[in-house]
Amino acid sequence: MDIDNSILIRVVLLGDYCVGKTTTGFVFDGKQFDFSRNCNIGVDFFVKHIVVDNQCVRLQVWDTGGQERFKTITRSYFRNTSCCLLFFSVDDQKSFENIDMWYSLAFEKYDLLNYPVVLVGNKIDLPQEKHVITKKMAEEWCKNQQTKLNLKFSIPYFETSAKNNININEIFYSAAELGLKNIVFKNNNNNNNYNNNNKLNGNKEIQNEKNKGMCFIL
């Protein structure tokens, strides 16, 4: 793994209080976590190096923890974000309904409308009778957002369990992959804009030179 040439991908974890964002981050980072502890309050981040499509990625994961309870998330928090993991709990109807609010917060208020997002339905280890949000409902939400907002990236959906380590690596690798694609997309756009601007400037210079050499008969 060539860490010196790694690409920085910044991922933000969003969602309601106590849906398992912090626990999921701990499990992915390989740390021991006390599942009986109280929900996290504050902001924390960790860095982990992974390989995606033969590219070394420096994955910087930012966890909003319980900060959303106090509505103190600021624009600067989302600066240089590459991708967002949007969480709800499969046993909590309200947390699923609130993903629209979180989506609006991150992708409209903070001008990140076309940034990639991965939808995460956590706590699938709970007994089936406690599940109130089905996979079909979540995938339908993803499809509707894609169509309604004409997003350049589709929204993948994963069902996860931090407790049983189900699909935890998958969601972060998916976020990193989408983040890389977003970087390529933005670089291509910047190059196109640069070339177009150069072409326009070049045409203006040519026209100016022509104007300088013109003879006007009065």
UniProtKB/Swiss-Prot annotation:
Residues 216-218 form a propeptide. Keywords: Cell membrane, GTP-binding, Lipoprotein, Membrane, Methylation, Nucleotide-binding, Prenylation. The modification Cysteine methyl ester is found at C215. InterPro entries: P-loop_NTPase (IPR027417), Small_GTP-bd (IPR005225), Small_GTPase (IPR001806). A motif (Effector region) lies at residues 37-45. It is a lipid-anchor. It is found in: Cell membrane. GO terms for molecular function: GTP binding; GTPase activity. GO terms for cellular component: plasma membrane. Gene3D superfamilies: P-loop containing nucleotide triphosphate hydrolases. It comes from the Eukaryota. Its main location: membrane. Pfam families: Ras. A lipid is attached at C215 (S-geranylgeranyl cysteine). Belongs to the small GTPase superfamily. Rab family. PANTHER family: RAB FAMILY, RAS-RELATED PROTEIN RAB-7A. This is Ras-related protein RabO. It comes from Dictyostelium discoideum. The lineage of its organism: Eukaryota, Amoebozoa, Evosea, Eumycetozoa, Dictyostelia. The gene is rabO.
